[in-house]
Design a protein with these regions (language model features):
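P-loop (Walker A) phosphate-binding loop of NTP-binding proteins
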Residues: 9, 21
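ATP-binding Walker
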Residues: 12
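ATP-dependent NMP and nucleoside kinases share a basic, alpha-helical "lid"
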Residues: 93-101, 106-142
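Small-molecule kinase domains that catalyze NTP-dependent phosphoryl transfer to phosphate-bearing small molecules
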Residues: 93, 120-122, 141-192, 200
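Walker A/P-loop
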Residues: 15
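ATP-dependent small-molecule kinase phosphotransfer cores
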Residues: 33-105
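Hydrophobic anchor at the beta1->P-loop junction of P-loop NTPases
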Residues: 6
């Protein structure tokens, strides 16, 4: 089994790249999605988050992710507290899911905070998707984020240089979908498939 970390700054296009890898035959997991599951109502994580941050983060009985996001992206201490609750549970969920996969699987693990979480050693290979700030900002505005939210979230993440230093390969993604797909296909054929042959034993 080959476990590949896929990282990149917010708005870089990680999810597009993950989708293309899935179409080519990989199994894709999203750390953010696992993090949502980890704090769903009824979970241990939910109780810990509400105890830590108070009822102000609740909306109709569920955690308001936008409100929680505003808190953690403006307060580094709050961010660390949340990560201490969520990260171990995310790792547990991922390990459980891996048990059901074939031994020759290529697993793409979409993890925005690879550099920040110091978790590079959990992966066989790491790829970062990078875009210029203007392109990322434009994409995030299309998602409905306000300018101050975009600036705050970008500032809270590792720099491009830091992400690149943790990775084996960089995918530049500044707009052209066809070019991006061709890059992903090339990486699949020339890098990941050969690597999987040595990790699938």
């Amino acid at each position: 089994m080959l476990i590949v970390a896929l990282t990149g700054g917010i708005g870089s296009g990680k999810s597009h790249v993950a989708k293309y890898f899935h179409q080519l035959g990989s199994y894709v997991f999203d750390a953010d999605q696992l993090a949502r599951i980890a704090i769903e109502r009824g979970s241990k994580g939910f109780d810990e988050v509400v105890t830590t941050f108070g009822d102000q983060i609740l909306k109709d009985g569920d955690i308001d992710r936008r409100k929680l996001g505003e808190i953690i992206f403006s307060d580094p201490t709050a961010k660390l507290k949340l990560e201490a609750i969520v990260h171990p549970e995310v790792q547990r969920l991922f390990e459980e899911a891996k048990k059901d996969l074939p031994m020759d699987a290529i697993v793409i693990y979409e993890i925005p905070l690879l550099a920040e979480s110091n978790s590079r050693n959990r992966f066989d290979y790491a790829i970062t998707v990078e875009s210029d700030v203007e392109t990322r900002t434009s994409r995030l505005k299309e998602r409905g984020l306000a300018s101050h939210e975009i600036v705050g979230r970008m500032a809270a993440q590792a720099s491009r240089e830091d992400r690149v230093s943790h990775c084996d390969l960089v995918i530049e993604n500044n707009g052209d979908e066809d070019a991006l797909l061709r890059k992903v296909e090339e990486i699949w054929q020339s890098v990941l498939l050969p690597l999987s042959k040595t990790h699938g034993k």
